[in-house]
């Protein structure tokens, strides 16, 4: 069963992880300023294409670098504002960015695979139906996040060791987006 069988239309929502999906991931480190943020090849054009195919595009990202004191919340927000602005300038859109800034060890964390960020997105955009949503990520926690809410899941292959089985695998976000 391929993406064309999912029946994706403008009532669907696209949930995206950030690092390793939208931008180059820094293994063993963090994107701490706009100068370190680099869109992966094809992402701007691919998301511009996807913007006409789905109703909402939402970024959900774990960013414990804030709790670790490596970047301020304002610094992280500035990176996200620049990301959204570049996307708009390219003709696409990102409707919202939700970032879990807590430590992995924090029991109150909203980090994926917990579904808090998706529920927050649904509160902001009540039309979101998780059974008509797709989660695209590059880690087990991304796929588990989507599966917990019965979303379709897409794994972007990376250096990350993944044990969870997604609905489909792709080499890059743009490879997936043009299947919508």
Task: Describe the function of each predicted region.
Residues 1-58:
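Active-site neighborhood of HAD-like aspartate-dependent phosphohydrolases
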Residues 21, 61, 153:
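Ser/Thr-centric signal marking residues that sit
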Residues 25, 62, 158:
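Histidine-centered beta-alpha loop that forms part of the nucleotide-sugar donor binding/catalytic region
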Residues 31, 36-37, 100, 114, ...:
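Flexible domain-boundary/linker segments
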Residues 19-41, 66-75, 89, 102-108:
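Metal-dependent phosphoesterase signature
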Residues 2-14, 74-93, 105-135, 139-180:
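Asp-based, Mg2+/Mn2+-dependent phosphohydrolase catalytic module
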Residues 35-36, 59, 92, 162:
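Sparse recognition of residues in long alpha-helices and their boundaries
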Residues 43, 47-80, 96-105, 146:
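Substrate-recognition element of Asp-dependent hydrolases with the DxDx(T/V) motif
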